Each structure stands twice: as C-alpha cells, then as structure tokens.
Amino acid sequence: MAPTLFQKLFSKRSGLGAPGRDARDPDCAFSWPLPEFDPSQIRLIVYQDCERRGRNVLFDSSVKRKNEDTSVSKLCNDAQVKVFGKCCQLKPGGDSSSSLDSSITLSSDGKDQCPKYQGSRCSSDANMLGEMMFGSVAMSYKGSTLKIHQIRSPPQLMLSKVFTARTGSSICGSLNTLQDSLEFINQDSNTLKADSSTVSNGLLGNIGLSQFCSPRRAFSEQGPLRLIRSASFFAVHSNPMDMPGRELNEDRDSGIARSASLSSLFITPFPSPNSSLTRSCASSYQRRWRRSQTTSLENGVFPRWSVEESFNLSDESCGPNPGIVRKKKIAIGVIFSLSKDEDENNKFNEFFFSHFPLFESHMNKLKSAIEQAMKMSRRSADASQRSLAYNRILDALTEFRTTICNLYTMPRIGEPVWLTMMSGTPEKNQLCHRFMKEFTFLMENASKNQFLPALITAVLTNHLAWVPTVMPNGQPPIKIFLEKHSSQSVGMLAKTHPYNPLWAQLGDLYGAIGSPVRLARTVVVGKRQDLVQRLLYFLTYFIRCSELQETHLLENGEDEAIVMPGTVITTTLEKGEIEESEYVLITMHRNKSSLLFKESEETRTPNCNCKYCSHPVLGQNTENVSQPEREDTQDNSKELLGISDECQKISPPDCQEENAVDVQQYRDKLRTCLDTKLETVVCTGSAPADKCVLSETCLEPREESWQNKELLDSDNHTGTAMRPTGIVVEKKPPDKNVPSAFSCEVTQTKVTFLIGDSMSPDSDTELRSQAVVDQINRHHSEPLKEDRGVADKHQESKITKDQSEDSDTQNIVSGESCELPCWSHSDPESMSLFDEYFNDDSIETRTIDDVPVKTSTDSKEYCCMLEYPKRLYTKTNKQKSELCKCIETVHQDSCNACFPQQDQRNSLSILVPHGDKESSDKKNAVGTEWDIPRNESSDSALGDSESEDTGPDIRRQAGGYCGGDQEDWTEEDEIPFPGSKLIEVSAVQPNIANFGRSLLGGYCSSYVPDFVLQGIGNDERLRQCLVSDLSHAVQHPVLDEPIAEAVCIIADMDKWTVQVASSQRRVTDNKLGKEVLVSSLVSNLLHSTLQLYKHNLSPNFCVMHLEDRLQELYFKSKMLSEYLRGQMRVHVKELGVVLGIESSDLPLLAAVASTHSPYVAQILL
C-alpha cells in the first residue's frame, strides 16, 4: 500500500529526522506530545470570611471519601439524612475544630441506597491556603481578586478568586448559605430561623440581563478591579508571559496589578486611530486596537464588560432587608497537584499560563454551579433538597475536572495545513501536493449528499479568520501565496499599541471578527477514524489564525539574553572608545542543539576555498546595532584570516600562483570591518536624494581598501564575503559616479544610526575615520582599473564554467543588475485594514563577511557597508523593485568553484521569494528543514517589540523577506562572547503554548468543548453538553468581550449531514441544529479546483486557484456591502437581478461582509 499523507506528514519536528509515523495510528496522536493528568489532581476548596464569624471552610474536596459507588442521583430517596458537625472553623492558632461542613450518615433503612461519606478533620493546609487566598484584601473592597499561587512543596498550582457577596434579605426562606444549610439540615424545619450572622457572600456571580447590557454598572458598584500575584509566580515561571487576553501592568510599589480578567469594552470612548477605519469597527485591526486601549493603564482602569465579580444569593421574589446584611467574602480555590517530574510540571505550567482564559472560563462555570446550589439550599427547608444541592457541587467539580483533563491530554493535529504554510516551511511544494491529494480523496469519497461543499460553506461562514488572509494588499497573488506574512497596518499596530498576541490568535480561531461577534467551533462525528482524521487535516486549511513566535527573556546582571527558537541573541553594554557615551552590542548566535543536519566533511570538495565552506553564515532575522570592542574585532579578523590561509592551502596550484598580495598586510584593515553583524533596513522620512549623510571621507578610503581586497579575492578565487545578502548600500559620495546595482527611478539615501554615537558629518568620529584613511593610504598600491580588469577576467571565466547555474546568478556574476518583476507600493486606499497575514515588509539582512564579493564595477557601493558594517541602516522609501532585485543578487562567483555539479551552497543562498524554483529540491539536501525562523505574525508582539522600526511612517518593504527560506544558514561555530549568558532553546516540538496548534484537536475519545476543531466517535456526550456549552460560551466568553452568538458546526460522517447549532436556537425534532444550505459559490470553488488538479496542473497552482476563488468571495461581499450602503431593506430577488447573487450564497457573503461592513448584518441578518 502506498504511503499516505499522514504517513509522510512532516517528520521534521520529531527530533533527529526519524521517518514520520502514521498519524492515523492512535499511539502517534498526530505527533502531539500527550501528557498525563489525572482528575484527582484537581482539588476544590471554598472559604467564607465573615466579619463576625471569621474564616470558615465551606467545602474541600480532598477530605471526602466515598465508601460506596452508588450513584449520587439516588441520594436520600427514602432515607432520613442526618448531618452533624459544623463548618471547619479556622482559628488563628492553626487548630481546626469539628469536622468539615458535612459528614453524612444514613439511617438503618437507607444504608444500601445512598453513598456514605466519612467525615474527617480539616486538611492540614487549610490555614495556609486561606491566608494565600484572602491575603490582605480589605473586607470593604467590593471587587473580586484573582490570584495565581505556585506552591513548591508539595508542588502545586492554585488558581483562586475572592468575591464579595450580593445578598438580599428574604422573609420567605432561610438566608443561610451552604454552611448554614448543612448545619441546620438536622433541625426541624419549623424551627428554622433566619440568623443575620449567617448571611453569606457569594462566589462568582451570574450574569444578570441588566448587568450584561450595562458594562458601566460594574464599575460603579465594584470600583477598580485588581490582581494580586504571589511572589512565587515570578520565581517559578522561568519565562514570564502575559496571561492571554489580559494585560498585566504591574504596580511595582504595591505589588498589585490590574485584574487578569480585565477586558476590553465593546464600545470604547476613544476616537478611532484613523478616520478611514471607522467603518470597519468590527474588523480584526479595530478589535486589536480596541484591545490595546482597554488593556493599557495609560488610559485608566476599565471594568469588565460584564459583572462576574460578585456572588448573587439574593432571592428576587423577596423584599430586601438591609438591616441584617453583613460583610462577607467567599473564596474559591482550584488547586492542581503537580507531579514530581520537573519537566511535566514545566509543561503544565506553560499550558496553564498560555491557556488561562479557558481555565478562568471553566472556573466561572464552576462558580455558577456552586451559586445555584447555594440558592437551592437556602430556599428549601427540606433536608434532602439541601443534600442534593451539596451533591450538585460535586457534579460540577467532576465536570470541571473532566474538562480540564481532556483539554490538556487530548490529541491534537500535529501539522495544521495553514499554520505550516505560515511557518515558512521549505516544503511548500510537498505540502501543496499532499493537501491536494487529500482534497481529491475527500471530494471523491465524502461528497455524498453534498457533504463536503456543505461543510466548507458552514466553515467559511462561521470561522471568518480566512477573510483577512485573502484581502488584497497591492501584491501579486503569487507573492501573497508564497510568503503569507503579516500586514503593514497590523504589524505597525502591534508595535505602537501592543495587545496580547494570544488573545488575538484565539479570536481568529473562533472566527470572532465579524459583526455581531460570533464564536464558532467545528465537530466531526464519525466511526471511521481514518476518514475523520483526513477531513480534520483538510479543514485546517480553512480554519485559520495567526502564527506566533515566542520570545523568552532572561536577565543576568547587566546582560540580557533574548532567546528565540533556534537562535540565541545576546546584548551587552559597551563603553565608547572615542566618546564617553555607551552603546549596546547585540550579537546573535546559532543554536547548535537544534541543528538537524551537519554537513559532512565529504561534501566539501578538496579545492574548496570559498567562504561558505570555511565560515558558515548566520541566517536569522534580527537587527543589530553595535560597534564591538577592539579586541573582539581582532579575534574575529584573526579567525577570518586564519580560515583564508587554510583555504589557500587546499586551493589548486594555479590559484596559489596568482597570490600576489600578502594576507597579513590587511590584518589591521580587517579589524575595522569584519565583525559578524546583521542589519535591518527600514524606511525613514524622505531625505534629499542628492545628499549623502555619511561624509565623503568615510567612504573614499574604503573604496581604496576594496581595491586591494578585491584583488586578493579575485586572485585567490576566495570569497571573503564582504557584501550582505540582498541589501547593498548604494549611496556614493556626491562627486563619484559609479553604476548602481539596481535600476531604480530615484536614487535614495542611506542613513546610518549608532546608539550612543553621533554619525553626523560634524561628528568627532570623523577624526577616527581620518585615521582609517591614513592607514589605508599607506597600503594603497594599485589603481582601481587594474583591479577591475583582473576581477572581470575571472568573472567571465566563471560565467563560462557555470552555465548550468541559475540565470539570476549569471546576471549577477556578469555585473548586470538582476531584473525581476517590479511591484509598487499599494496606495492607502487599497491597503487592507486587517490584512494581517500578508507581507511583513521588513528586510533584515546580513552584513557579515561571508557572502561572495560583488563585481568591481559596483565596488564603491560597498564603501558604506565596509566602513560601518556594524550599524543600523535606514533608508528612504526604496521601491520594492530594488528590494526584489537586491535579494536575488547574492554573488556566487566564489562558491561556483566548490560545487561544480550540484552547488548546494549556491542553491541555498539564493532566496526565491517570488516562486519556488527547480533548485528547491536541492535546498532539502542540506540544512535544517524544521529549524526555520518563523514568520513574525502581526500578533507577535514578542518578536515585533524587539524591532527598531516603531515610527508611525514605517512601511516595511516586501521584496526581500529573508526569513521563510533561510533554511540554508544551518552551520555555525559559536564563539562565546565575554560577559554574556547564552541560553539555548529547542523548538523541535510542537508548542503547546500556542492556541493555533493546541485547539485544533485530533480524533478524541470524548467531546472537548474548548476545541475549535475536533473529531469524535459518537455524539452522545455532544448531545448532553452542547446546549449548556453554547450558553456558557456567551455568558462567560473567553475573549472578554460581548459575544452575540455561539455556534457549533456538527459534521456527521456516518449520516453525511452538516448542521449548525446556535445558542439562539432551540434544538428541535431530535436534531442538534439547523441543516446547512450549500453555497453555489463554494461548490463551484471546490469542483473547479478539483478539475484543475485532475488535468495535471501543479498542486501549487491549484492551491493558488483556491486562494483566488476565496478572494472572489471577498470581492463579492464588498460589492454586496457597497450596494446595501444606505438602504434599509432589500429583497433577495433584487440582489439576484442586480448583483447576480443567489439566495444560497447570501448567508456566506453577508457573514464575510460583516467583517468589513458591520451595517450589512443589520440589513440582512
């Protein structure tokens, strides 16, 4: 049997290149690490703190032991229940009196029917946990307080929330809470009396209708919401990160931060950041901006949009009696007992903090159940009712435990299609091929009853995050398809107005970007696991979200290590050599442990004397602003020259005979220019095109230095790699006229910045530059023309030798500028407001000395680069055409001699951002396929925040993105830098701290309500939980913003039906939801793509066609929204006649239009 897609599914994350296992194998679990977690590791404890009574334990799950397995539902049918003992009273001395709240025994005639609980004394840690929960919160404080505690011995993680009760007096029943009801169950109901001292505060209140509609009410009643975090939170969690959906701006004096639950309001008092965005208030961009405003303390403290901060025990049918109200607080604590394995604990910690909104949402659901149970126990004088109320809490705890365990342990889809495309994989061709094979299989085997078109229609209608990915961005479709980066507008927003990227990713997954906001999830039901898994994999192309990149920040004295997957970046503070100011040295190192392949010595040819083989290249995207100390540069140059000498020894004799220049005499010059650095090219404000910021004296000497250096390189055929990949500094002194490397309409200006050092023409550093001039003049011996002649001679010979090389490379070698398609910037009108998956147009390139030399005709262009290889260069609005050309102009003249038959280094070093070339197969031969720096998402404030380009006018350039295809820079000999602590992070495993991968479930044994996508064997559990889950999603939304509707798409592969269940519709006729109306547009989209593939068109082209057809849906929705503008009521027939929109397409187009034109929903929905 031929290997299937899942057998061949990327094995690059499996560690050391082991062959991929069949992901359909249950043991494989889609290559997702399956942790173990037992429900018994979750403990619930409830406290009451009363002004008069002090602190009591109301409930503690750890001290109950069932002696019989009889169902709780049979409790007390005919048995007389006797409950004795009072609540555990916590005394200051630490002693605990009596037993816990209830110790249930049964009369002799009921022993066989009811479960029996054996009472025990309070747990030994009750005092400690109570102090941790209540802390120093004043009794008069009316808000709720959320805390996260990490207990080291035994290892535990506790999530606690303290609430103020809202109790109303009642003359129709007892005012007692659970504690009081348990105390008085035993008494005659006629003698029950209201005791004002037993009025309890509540836990986490329900959302009343008035509270749901009036977010301001919460603020007036409760005041600011705060979070008090225990110190151990920071001590244990080694990589502090925001809790998703929150903004924790800590007050360093008081240790009190904003509530971790603080959320954005649906309507904010802030003006729109751009008048052109006002019409898209429901867009992804606007949601992110609103989130930034309402989670920033600069704008004051905002309340949650709904009131969940108090516990409502009041009985609305009874009148108030404020005379007997006492101040009380209730605390709920959920304690997770961790294992003794430190690695497992770290995994759970990472999962807990990254998925905190889900934990809090389920805690709110647990609180609601406890609240209802307390109300039940208060209303009834019947002892059996109160016991049932107690057991309701146990049932709610059981459900909470099951949900959390399933969320943590269920299998996930190992390689979602869309996220894998987003992550810059070099296997795009293979990925498209596999996707199209699965697509063809499903179209042929799962189209009964139009099942697949109906399912895709439902997914595209509800999971709306695909819309921003197809919106036009002024780029050709091939570029958009290949690079899939983030948008300019959203990328800029992430820098200037940071929001939590995990929150944005979660909203994308649930499709909550339309208006009104809707949460969606998809469940595939089927007994054939193989078929269900293939469909789940296929759906991960349409259910999209942003890809995130996590950055770990560790401090070590004055040094700081910023660790990204696969790399280590260190920053140190260095003193200036000329001026007294200090500057920052930022250095990037390759992560050795994450390398999958090392090039063997045999792959290097004996006569290889190129820089690539001798000194491999660094290839990460990061900016460096530095001027290292003299001794560091000496070490670097010595090492470089040593390598150059070594290359000479193994070079052919005829090459050695041409060595006319002694390497040693350039040692001093190299010290000033051979440091391993990176640069980031960004736009600055426009500067005069005819002026050069760098002084002429800074440039001319390097021209002369280049002559000698070029002669050395051309004679030896060695590429000492003086020019950067992609970006050259094309500015020349005003009096020089050297042909440019690019055909550009307007010559632009390079501006150089150095932290702590002024580089203006009148700077003191000109003295230093002059010293360099004098030094170079002493060694200057030959005119430029002679050097050019020698260089051109070798250039021509190399062109003849390497006719099989890429045409772009030949153009470069011959000194011609590489002409590539030229795309201009999109004007503001065509810029997408939330096109967050398009090009993040930053160009981050290398200025290190390991790329072959440029032809001598362009030598002067490199003067700036050679003079200041360690600077951060900025530029003025360079056209994309230059960047596209420039990224292709990697000079390969030195490398061609090394690999005449299959120049692996050559194929690796030439980036192909505009289309996969045939040489892409070579790329996979050498290099770490799985260790690619991920494309920075628009949501990744982690990566973006480190960037220098934070100005409002920044337009990051698209053509030269150097991240997605940089699998070639794999080998690097790390040189330890003094005073820097290097931290290595391995990124070979799927990241569980990422909603995009953790919420796309595989084939699960049980229904998991939090999963955005999952497969299950039967719908029994789904039918039980669906209604309550949808209601809970609206009442306690994980996104902390009002949700109008929660929907669930149920695709039954046994019955070939697709239904959509909604929180706004009641289930009728034993159906889970409403049947889906198949969109003719979607049906045509699927069939046309299938026909193209059957006609043997390339999988890449078929997927591009699929993207084009999705974009057509967007354009039709724009047309619909424009037609509906200003209208109040439109007939469907009118839309069909005027716009050609069929009635079956209207729900889909209206949903898509709601992402950019909210008024459409008011007219059509």
Curated annotation (Swiss-Prot):
Organism of this sequence: Mus musculus
Result of changing T605A: Does not affect recognition by the CRL2(FEM1B) complex and subsequent ubiquitination
Phenotype when changing C613S: Abolished recognition by the CRL2(FEM1B) complex and subsequent ubiquitination
Effect of Y612A: Reduced but not abolished recognition by the CRL2(FEM1B) complex
Region Interaction with HSP90AA1, residue ranges: 928-1165
Stated consequence of mutating P606A: Does not affect recognition by the CRL2(FEM1B) complex and subsequent ubiquitination
Post-translational modifications: Phosphorylated by AMPK in response to energetic stress. Phosphorylation by AMPK in response to mitochondrial damage promotes inactivation of the non-canonical mTORC1 signaling, nuclear translocation of TFEB and TFE3, inducing transcription of lysosomal or autophagy genes. Sequential phosphorylation by CK2 promotes its gradual interaction with HSP90AA1/Hsp90. Priming phosphorylation at Ser-937 is followed by relay phosphorylation at Ser-938, Ser-940, Ser-945 and Ser-947, promoting its gradual interaction with HSP90AA1/Hsp90.
Mutagenesis / variant outcome for changing C608S: Abolished recognition by the CRL2(FEM1B) complex and subsequent ubiquitination. Reduced zinc-binding
Family: Belongs to the FNIP family.
Domain cDENN FNIP1/2-type, first and last residues per copy: 486-1091
Compositional bias per record (Low complexity), positions renumbered to this chain: 93-108
Outcome of substituting E602R: Does not affect recognition by the CRL2(FEM1B) complex and subsequent ubiquitination
Renumbered ranges of motif Cys degron: 608-615
Keywords annotated in UniProt: Cytoplasm, Glycoprotein, Isopeptide bond, Lysosome, Membrane, Oxidation, Phosphoprotein, Ubl conjugation
GO biological-process terms attached to the record: B cell apoptotic process; cellular response to starvation; immature B cell differentiation; negative regulation of cell population proliferation; negative regulation of lysosome organization; negative regulation of TOR signaling; negative regulation of transcription by RNA polymerase II; positive regulation of B cell apoptotic process
Effect of R604A: Does not affect recognition by the CRL2(FEM1B) complex and subsequent ubiquitination
Function: Binding partner of the GTPase-activating protein FLCN: involved in the cellular response to amino acid availability by regulating the non-canonical mTORC1 signaling cascade controlling the MiT/TFE factors TFEB and TFE3. Required to promote FLCN recruitment to lysosomes and interaction with Rag GTPases, leading to activation of the non-canonical mTORC1 signaling.
Record note on what altering T603A does: Does not affect recognition by the CRL2(FEM1B) complex and subsequent ubiquitination
Protein's UniProt name: Folliculin-interacting protein 1
Any matching Pfam family: FNIP_M
Cellular component GO terms held in the UniProt record: cytoplasm; cytosol; lysosomal membrane
